[in-house]
């Protein structure tokens, strides 16, 4: 199941990253050309923002690819919070090593009930249970041995050998 917001954000991200027009041949034989288009970026990004009662972006903002990329990353983080998409987003953007190799900060979940104020103090969580790591090899999944055995031309992904 794809949410409408995910479809819109995927489209905005794709057209923001296009460097040159791309033509697709459709099953009925017609062709559709997609290109970097700031008007579409504004239109579809703002559909998400406006339905939440938030201000949209302007054509001037949409003209800056890097700014739009950062806005998309931020919007996806909020729109899909607790939906399990963040890990794959970070991998796709190449941001996972930076994000997962730093300590987690947040509420002090170890504060006792009589230390209510300590709960709201931002704390670095750096114990065995909260420590995370991400290395280059995690950008790729290992190819199962059964698949490698069936096709001798396949080579295991880097660092999974």
Which residues make up each language-model segment?
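A generic structural signal for short coil/turn motifs at secondary-structure boundaries
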Residues: 23, 56-58
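Structured segments of extracytoplasmic/periplasmic soluble domains
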Residues: 11-18, 44-55, 71, 75-79
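C-terminal substrate/ligand-recognition segments
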Residues: 1-44
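Long, intrinsically disordered, low-complexity segments
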Residues: 1, 49, 59-161
């Amino acid at each position: 199941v794809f949410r409408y917001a995910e479809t819109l954000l995927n489209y905005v991200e794709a057209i923001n990253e296009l460097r040159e027009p791309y033509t697709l041949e459709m099953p009925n034989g017609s062709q559709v050309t997609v290109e970097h288009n700031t008007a579409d970026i504004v239109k579809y990004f703002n559909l998400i923002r406006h339905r939440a009662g938030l201000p949209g972006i302007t054509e001037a903002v949409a003209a800056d690819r890097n700014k739009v990329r950062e806005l998309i990353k931020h919007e996806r983080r909020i729109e899909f919070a607790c939906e399990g998409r963040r890990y794959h987003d970070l991998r796709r953007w190449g941001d996972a090593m930076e994000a997962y190799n730093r300590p987690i900060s947040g509420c002090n979940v170890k504060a006792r009930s009589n230390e209510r104020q300590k709960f709201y103090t931002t704390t670095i969580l750096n114990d065995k249970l909260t420590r995370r790591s991400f290395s280059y090899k995690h950008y790729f999944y290992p190819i199962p041995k059964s698949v490698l055995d069936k096709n001798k031309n396949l080579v295991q992904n880097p660092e999974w050998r």
